[in-house]
Amino acid sequence: MATITAAMVKDLRETTGVGMMDCKQALTENDGDMQAAIDWLRKKGLSKAAKKAGRVAAEGLIGAVTSGNKGVVVEVNSETDFVARNEQFQGLVKMVAQVALSVGADVEVIKAAKVGSATVETAISDAIATIGENMTLRRAASLEVSKGLVASYVHNAVIDGAGKMGVIVALESSGNADELAALGRQIAMHVASSNPLAIDPSGVDPAVVKREKDILADKFRQQGKPEAMIEKITESGLKTFFKEQTLLEQPFIFDDKKSVGQALKDAEGKVGAPVKLTGFVRYALGEGIEKAESDFAAEVAAAAGQG
């Protein structure tokens, strides 16, 4: 049996908004497994959390750069936010993004690419030596369309094209470039805000759909719904899930009376041609990286020779 710590209970509460005692019970029932505890709470009808939020602990910057029909987004991590505010580091992130725009989104290819007489990897090493803190190019992604454009949006930007979150969106169209760019930026801002799982239901991981369906079915059984009705009301619940989690079905943040899909269709008049959203990438700094929280009092005691 796993030891359930106060920190684990706190994390679960922050993720789900559920009371401390229910969070502790959920963790106890699931042997400390955070994701299983979230699912357990949802089956009990106590939590609306659709997925584990994950603690964002890494520092650094997201860089997003576009040029006509292609765009890239990169994540460069540092150890502290202090370094992320350093002009040399910010310049490094923009340089890495520009290189990725030329050579593609393979991290190893980016690191091996030449910038002047040196490689990107050497430039990162030089920055580490100068600034005195470890830095890593963690990931990169790119989008391209044959006709149309790739738009971008950077949230909490510290400089143009670099901040704590970056989004690129690919729109395929032969219409007016200025109207398409304005539309693309709005869609990118929507993606940053609403964090969709996929463009439409067909793009959602089947394992995620199955898990959601199982959670809904278990929840309805616990509510005493007749077994004959469960399949039907579960399918209805899945429609709600897709409306909340897929881009084209989400209510558009600039006009929530219509979906993103409807907003795209309505924009075709201004653009002057059909518009198809072919892809999006959303990077939030530190996604999936978990850094142990230090016990400040213990550190002070240890430094004083008391620990």
From Swiss-Prot:
GO MF annotations, alphabetized: translation elongation factor activity
| Gene Ontology cellular component annotations, sorted alphabetically | cytoplasm
* The entry's keywords: Cytoplasm, Elongation factor, Protein biosynthesis
Recorded hits in SUPFAM superfamilies, A to Z, give:
Elongation factor Ts (EF-Ts), dimerisation domain, UBA-like
Q: What broad class describes the main subcellular location of this protein?
A: cytoplasm
> Which CDD domains does the annotation name?
UBA_EF-Ts
Pfam families referenced in this protein's UniProt entry, alphabetically: EF_TS
Q: Does the entry annotate any disulfide bonds, and if so which pairs?
A: none
Task: Determine the domain of life of the protein's source.
Answer: Bacteria
Q: Which family does it belong to?
A: Belongs to the EF-Ts family.
Q: Which HAMAP family match?
A: EF_Ts
Q: What does this protein do?
A: Associates with the EF-Tu.GDP complex and induces the exchange of GDP to GTP. It remains bound to the aminoacyl-tRNA.EF-Tu.GTP complex up to the GTP hydrolysis stage on the ribosome.
Q: What is this protein's record name?
A: Elongation factor Ts
Tell me which species this is from. Nitrobacter hamburgensis (strain DSM 10229 / NCIMB 13809 / X14)
Gene that produces this protein: tsf
